[in-house]
Design a protein with these regions (language model features):
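Catalytic center-proximal scaffold of phosphoryl-transfer enzymes
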Residues: 1-205
C-alpha cells in the first residue's frame, strides 16, 4: 500500500518532472540443480528538486526491459529525465504527453573521463575540454538559480535568455568535430549527437 501510494503521488498531475535511472546488480539464486548468478536491474524514480515533497521509488527488475515502466507511466503527462537508453525513446513514442530530457550528467561524464586523462599541456587545446567547459556553464546556471531560489517562471525566463548562446556554442563544437573513429572523443561526440534533440527540453520547463 505504501509503494502504491508513493507511485500515485509521483504520477500526480502536479509532478511535472520525473528522473529515471537504473543500475545493475548480480543476484544469486538457487534453482533445482545449482546456484546461478544473474545480472538484474534496479530502477529508481524520483521527482524534481523543486517539488515540496520528495519521492524516491526503487523498482527491482530481472531485465533492463522498460515494459513494466511503460505500463505505469502510460498516463503520465510531463518530462522524464533519463539517459539515452532506447527504451525511453519508445516511451515517448507510446505516450505523446511525455517529453524527454536527456541527462546532461551522463553526457558530461563522457568528456570528464577524457579530460582527466589528458596532460596539462594537452587539456586547454583539446576539443573535449572545450565541450566540457560549455556543458559546465549550463550546470553553473542551474546552480545559480537554486541559490537564488528563483520561482519556476523566473527560471524559465532566465533559461530562455541565457541558454541559447551556450547551446549554439555546443552545437558548433559537437557537430563540426571530426574525431578519429573509435576514439573516446568519437564515442562522446556520437552519444551527444544521439541525445541532441532531447538535451534542451529544460529551457521551457
Amino acid at each position: 500500500p505504501i509503494y502504491d501510494r508513493m507511485q500515485e503521488d509521483l504520477l500526480n498531475n502536479q509532478v511535472k518532472v520525473i528522473h529515471s535511472d537504473e543500475t545493475t546488480l548480480v543476484v544469486s539464486r538457487k534453482d533445482e540443480e545449482n546456484k546461478d548468478r544473474k545480472k538484474s536491474y534496479v530502477y529508481v524514480y524520483t521527482n524534481s528538486f523543486y517539488d515540496k515533497k520528495r519521492i524516491r521509488i526503487y523498482d527491482f527488475q530481472e531485465s533492463r526491459s522498460i515494459d513494466k515502466t511503460a505500463k505505469w507511466l502510460k498516463n503520465y503527462q510531463g518530462v522524464i529525465v533519463c539517459d539515452n537508453y532506447n527504451g525511453y525513446n519508445s516511451l515517448k513514442k507510446q505516450n505523446e504527453n511525455i517529453k524527454l530530457q536527456k541527462c546532461w550528467a551522463h553526457v558530461r561524464r563522457k568528456y570528464t573521463d577524457i579530460v582527466k586523462n589528458l596532460k596539462p599541456k594537452e587539456k586547454n587545446n583539446s576539443k573535449a575540454y572545450k565541450i566540457l567547459q560549455a556543458i559546465q556553464q549550463l550546470f553553473n546556471l542551474e546552480s545559480s538559480y537554486k541559490r537564488k531560489n528563483l520561482l519556476a517562471d523566473e527560471r524559465v525566463e532566465r533559461r530562455r535568455n541565457e541558454v541559447p548562446s551556450i547551446k549554439e556554442k555546443l552545437e558548433k563544437l559537437v557537430f563540426e568535430s571530426n574525431p578519429i573513429k573509435g576514439s573516446a572523443l568519437y564515442t562522446a561526440i556520437e552519444y551527444t549527437k544521439e541525445c541532441w534533440n532531447d538535451l534542451f527540453t529544460f529551457i521551457d520547463n
